[in-house]
Amino acid sequence: MRPGTRRRSEPRSEKLSEQIARQVLHDIEDQKLTPGTQLPAESAMCERFNVGKASVREAMRILEINGLISIRTGSGGGPVVGSTDGRGYGSMSTLHFQSMGATLRDLMNARTALEPILAAQAAAQPGTEAGEALRASLECSLHVSRTDSLRFASSNSDFHAVLYSVSGNPILALMARALRDIWSVRVESVMLPEGERHEVESAHKRITDAVEQHDSQEAERQVREHLEFYREFCEENYPHILSDVVEWW
């Protein structure tokens, strides 16, 4: 079957490589393939789609550059399903951010607008799973020494990642993870001193409490205040970094 014959409608005329990429993406979706799953070899795809190697390779490149697959080298290598952690989406986004001249200040403002929405949705989730997941992440972070800057930053980032994941909104969660990942590229240059880290821990506790109590308004407020605190700290101490244009990575 040639890639253009699938029953799903296509929004425009596509190159063969784009049709192949779209079909492979449908396969991943339909078969519920998980990250790391091996995809068919190049020769098998050429035979299936009745196309040459160039079209298949271009299709794989389209998927790879968007973080949807990765290419393993060596024995047993080939295309595998990529991770859904948001880094691929984030990398693609930085191309657009750089082209429009968006700064890290713009990115921080976007996080401040987006994450409170996710917190409110997390608190609105039925049952106890959202609160339990956040509580577990919080407890892990409390064991990290405040004097270890890199580990503290990593545990702080992990807490926010859990908050996104329990929101019940996969699209906004993906966007938030992407913005967080773009920001984390500069995390070694933007470190909270030990004195301010206590406030971060306290904020995370208040956020967790609000989600556990299913208090959406309070969860939203706490996350907004938490990020505004961090943004103000960056404005006071690292304004030059916030003025930097986001670069493709």
Task: Identify the meaning behind each predicted range.
Residues 1-113, 120, 124, 241-242, ...:
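Short linear motifs at protein or domain termini
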Residues 2-7, 217-249:
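C-terminal effector-binding regulatory domain of bacterial HTH transcription factors
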Residues 107-189, 200-208, 218-233:
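Conserved amphipathic alpha-helical segments that form helical-bundle/coiled-coil interaction surfaces
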